[in-house]
């Protein structure tokens, strides 16, 4: 009986290997040869799943953005008050653990590549747009519940996104989460300013 191969799982495994190599050695370390060796493939066998490094990088970029979206959705408790949901969204967008920090570090390593790839630029801008809309929506819901004051929520969402991106950059130098308490304090201060 022929062996059944889950090709989608193999692609996911290859992306995980690429992420691991990028974390250890940066973008340049993730060559087709290094990815194949780490994944246990012959160099040419990767081409069955990805035609080249560009397609692996694109899949890795998409995977990291999907991870961030998933963590954000999972941070929200059903039935929470609008203010608590806002707090959860804020907490879900700032790095809160080693896995989120590692994922952010991979994303940053891929930014330079994404700048010259129109499809990835659009993908990231779309991600930022969803994130911004979610923050504004959560602030408006908290306002409607009487928990926070009416303010320029679009500007506040932009500020928060900038801080979250900055936290991701800072984590390049603090990969073990030494700054997580600072981010939690910032969320408390941000919420206090909204009240």
Predicted features by range, described:
Residues 13, 17-25, 71-75, 106, ...:
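Solvent-exposed, amphipathic alpha-helical segments
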Residues 101, 119-125, 129, 143-190, ...:
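Hydrophobic/aromatic-rich alpha-helical bundle segments in the mid-to-C-terminal region
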Residues 24-28, 79, 100, 145:
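Short coil/turn segments at alpha/beta junctions that flank glycine-rich nucleotide-binding fingerprints
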Residues 98-122:
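Amphipathic alpha-helical segments used for helix-helix packing
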Residues 1-9:
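N-terminal intrinsically disordered/low-complexity leader segments
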Residues 13, 17-59:
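Helix-turn-helix
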Residues 11, 15, 61, 65, ...:
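Amphipathic, non-transmembrane alpha-helical scaffold segments
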Residues 59-62, 70-103, 154-160, 184:
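Hydrophobic alpha-helical connector segments
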């Amino acid at each position: 009986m022929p062996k059944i191969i889950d090709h989608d799982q193999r692609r996911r495994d290859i992306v995980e290997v690429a992420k691991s190599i990028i974390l250890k050695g940066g973008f340049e370390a993730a060559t087709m040869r290094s990815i194949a060796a780490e994944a246990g493939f012959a160099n040419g066998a990767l081409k069955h799943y990805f035609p080249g490094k560009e397609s692996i990088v694109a899949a890795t970029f998409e995977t990291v953005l999907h991870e961030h979206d998933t963590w954000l959705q999972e941070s929200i408790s059903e039935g929470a008050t609008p203010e608590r949901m806002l707090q959860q969204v804020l907490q879900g967008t700032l790095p809160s653990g080693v896995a989120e920090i590692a994922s952010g570090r991979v994303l940053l390593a891929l930014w330079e590549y994404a700048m010259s790839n129109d499809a990835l630029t659009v993908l990231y801008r779309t991600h930022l747009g969803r994130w911004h809309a979610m923050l504004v929506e959560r602030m408006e819901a908290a306002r409607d519940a009487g928990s926070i004051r009416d303010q320029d929520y679009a500007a506040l969402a932009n500020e928060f996104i900038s801080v979250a991106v900055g936290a991701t950059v800072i984590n390049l130098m603090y990969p073990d989460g030494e700054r997580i308490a600072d981010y939690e304090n910032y969320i408390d201060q941000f919420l206090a300013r909204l009240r």
